């Protein structure tokens, strides 16, 4: 997992509350157990007018040219609600999103996003409103998420955010559960060497 310190990118506004995991990645695309290849199905039922995913919906924000290459998703409250499928953050990451900004996230989605190297940023509702207004006035604007400073910076706006220190440490250093365990590889090997061979 790659460490996250700062990221500056185009922000795309998804002006919907309670976006659930079935909207993020519909159930018919959950047939794989690796993380690659889900991005093309992200928001499938909103991005496309047909089941085969061949006819883009020109009204959907991700299909609008000013947001091409967006890597920051701006959303409303309770993002990622619904089922606990880890495929949801996989799809967002595979599409190219590095961070998601919203007033609140579903708890399981929040943890899954962090475990997959994405930074879910919780801002106050009025701060999210200000970002939506900024993007409406300047479509395609880039904003910066700084995990070292715990700040979101955009134009003249600067908002602080909070994140659990352990999770912040993991994101900054690119550590998932396996990476954390491997930090103690020498101690684990030393412990195992002292155990009877039949254990």
UniProtKB/Swiss-Prot annotation:
InterPro entries: 3-IsopropMal_deHydase_ssu (IPR004431), Aconitase/3IPM_dehydase_swvl (IPR015928), AconitaseA/IPMdHydase_ssu_swvl (IPR000573), IPMI_Swivel (IPR033940), LeuD (IPR050075). Pathway: Amino-acid biosynthesis; L-leucine biosynthesis; L-leucine from 3-methyl-2-oxobutanoate: step 2/4. GO terms for cellular component: 3-isopropylmalate dehydratase complex. It holds the Pfam family Aconitase_C. It catalyses: (2R,3S)-3-isopropylmalate = (2S)-2-isopropylmalate. The keyword Amino-acid biosynthesis applies. Signal peptide: none annotated. Coiled coil: none annotated. Keywords: Amino-acid biosynthesis, Branched-chain amino acid biosynthesis, Leucine biosynthesis, Lyase. GO terms for molecular function: 3-isopropylmalate dehydratase activity. One of its GO terms (biological process) is L-leucine biosynthetic process. It is an enzyme of class 4 (lyase). Its EC number is 4.2.1.33. The keyword Iron-sulfur does not apply. Heterodimer of LeuC and LeuD. HAMAP family: LeuD_type1 (MF_01031). Catalyzes the isomerization between 2-isopropylmalate and 3-isopropylmalate, via the formation of 2-isopropylmaleate. NCBIfam families: leuD (TIGR00171), PRK01641.1 (NF002458). Belongs to the LeuD family. LeuD type 1 subfamily. This is 3-isopropylmalate dehydratase small subunit. The lineage of its organism: Bacteria, Pseudomonadati, Pseudomonadota, Gammaproteobacteria, Aeromonadales.
